[in-house]
Structures are given as structure tokens and as C-alpha cells.
Amino acid sequence: MKVLMINGSPHVKGNTRIALDEMVKIFEKEGIDTEIIHVGHQDIRGCIACMTCKKGKNQCVFDDLVNQVAPKFEQCDGFVVGTPVYYGSANSTLISFLTRLFYSTSFDKTMKVGASVVVARRGGISSTYDEINKFFAISGMPIASTQYWGRTQRRSSMALSIGTV
């Protein structure tokens, strides 16, 4: 069994990665393979509705990380998306990535489990959780539920001030 995890934060070792790493520990205890792909710092364009992906190629016209991740997405059994909250929604780079990834891949996703991890300092947790879960729901994927919208608390102010976490 394999779980593909997407880090939508622009910070490679930020709060979102810390939350995903906690999940990796649990998956490893259960003998589940994981891979984390960091997309939040990438230059990823949004979908331009050119329909190239629907004209037989099953890949996006922009040859970037989306096309590299698509085969891994097809092969995984679980798909976890982690994101920080910016202005009440997910990181826009992540949304561009997910929109193109889900739209350009035509394989059946109905038995692939999706899960969201949302990290915020203030508000926007529930709307961001809903925003990510819509990708799963629209694709007919079972959604791994959690308590209190899959959110995490930000790092403590002490940890932020010394930069050790």
C-alpha cells in the first residue's frame, strides 16, 4: 500500500510539513509506504481550459510537476493534501496544481482515499478543508474523515522565536 502526500506550503520545513511528517510516522507503523512531494514553492500555472489533456494524451499541455506527479497519483492507494491557510483558503499554487492534476488525469479515482490536512494560525480552517475535499468528492473518492476539520495548531510562539521547530 502506498500513500502519496502533497505539501502545499511554500515552506519546505514549515508547519504543514510537520503535520505531514506526523502522519508518515503513523503510516510507517502500519507498514504503509509514503512519499511527500513539495509543490508549494513551485512555479505552477493554472489551468487554461485548452482541453489538450482530453485530446488523447492524458497529460497537461504544461510539462511541469503536474505531469511528473500524475503517474504516482494513479499508482497510489491514498492521497493526502496538506496546505496552510492564506486569506481563508489554500495556497493558490496548490490549487493550480490540484486543478490541473485532477482534470488532466482520466483514470478511475473512486477507490483512492483522499485526506486533507489544514494548518492555520487564525480563521479559514473549515473553508480550506472543504476546498481541498471538493477535489476528492467531485472525483468520487472516499474521504478520510477526522475530528475538527483535520486542522493543526500553529507552532508555539517560543518555538517560532528560537526557530527550532
Give, region by region, the residue ranges found by the protein language model:
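Glycine-rich phosphate/pyrophosphate-binding loop and the adjoining helix
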Residues: M1, V24, E28-K29, P142-V165
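Short, glycine/serine-rich, charged loops/turns that create anion-binding
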Residues: P10-H11, H41, R121
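A short beta-strand-loop structural module common to alpha/beta enzyme folds
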Residues: I32-Q42
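Short, hinge-like loop/turn segments at secondary-structure boundaries
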Residues: M51-K55, T99, N133, I162-G163
